[in-house]
C-alpha cells in the first residue's frame, strides 16, 4: 500500500490529499457512486503508461489493503492515516503503537475480580487502550 501511495505522492501531490482521496475512492467504488468517484479522480492527471497512472496506483493500493486484511488481523488504516494524513497537516499527533504497548506493559496490574482499569493518558485515538 505504502509503495502505491508513495508513487502518487512522488508526482507532487499532497500526502494528506492522497490518503483522503484514496479512502474516498474506496468508499465510492464500493457504493458504486460513479459521479463522486469520477469527481475525485478528476483531481489527478492519470497520464502515462498503464500501471503507472494515479488511478492504477490507487487501485493497486486497494488490492494490497484487501490482501493484507485477509492475511492478518492487524489494524492498518489507522497507522496509514497517522503517517499520511495527520501530524503537521492537521495538528494531530499519535502515540506510536510500540510506545503504547510499552506503556500498557508497564502499567498493567493484576486485575481484581470484576474490576478493570483503563489508562489512556491522552484520551485520543485510543492507542493505549488498543495496546492493552
Residue ranges and their predicted role:
Residues 1-122, 128-131:
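Class I S-adenosyl-L-methionine
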Amino acid at each position: 500500500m505504502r509503495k502505491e501511495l508513495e508513487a502518487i505522492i512522488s508526482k507532487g501531490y499532497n500526502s494528506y490529499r492522497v490518503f483522503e482521496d484514496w479512502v474516498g475512492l474506496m468508499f465510492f467504488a464500493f457504493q458504486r457512486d460513479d459521479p463522486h468517484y469520477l469527481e475525485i479522480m478528476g483531481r489527478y492527471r492519470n497520464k502515462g503508461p498503464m500501471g503507472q497512472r494515479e488511478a492504477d496506483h490507487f487501485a493497486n493500493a486497494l488490492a494490497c489493503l484487501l490482501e493484507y486484511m485477509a492475511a492478518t488481523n492487524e489494524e492498518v488504516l489507522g497507522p496509514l492515516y497517522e503517517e499520511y494524513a495527520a501530524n503537521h497537516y492537521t495538528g494531530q499527533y499519535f502515540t506510536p503503537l510500540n510506545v503504547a504497548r510499552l506503556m500498557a506493559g508497564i502499567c498493567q496490574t493484576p486485575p481484581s475480580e470484576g474490576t478493570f482499569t483503563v489508562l489512556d493518558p491522552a484520551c485520543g485515538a485510543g492507542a493505549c487502550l488498543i495496546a492493552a
